[in-house]
Amino acid sequence: MPDVKCVCCKEGKECACFGQDCCKTGECCKDGTCCGICTNAACKCANGCKCGSGCSCTEGNCAC
């Protein structure tokens, strides 16, 4: 798994595309550069997020 920050969520997967168009289209997931599973679609946090719907994400990091 690449060491990248995931800030995008499409189809239940996080993508490392940092607000580019692929974040909207889901291309970053389709072309194999997904790097994790979204625990919260609105928050787009990585697997370690335990804040639930009360968290906010900045560059892949959760903050309750």
Curated annotation (Swiss-Prot):
Keywords: Metal-binding, Metal-thiolate cluster. GO terms for molecular function: metal ion binding. Pfam families: Metallothio_6. Induction: By heavy metals. InterPro entries: Metalthion_4_echinoid/annelid, Metalthion_4_echinoidea, Metalthion_dom_sf. It comes from the Eukaryota. Disulfide bonds: none annotated. Belongs to the metallothionein superfamily. Type 4 family. Metallothioneins have a high content of cysteine residues that bind various heavy metals. This is Metallothionein-A. It comes from Strongylocentrotus purpuratus. The gene is MTA.
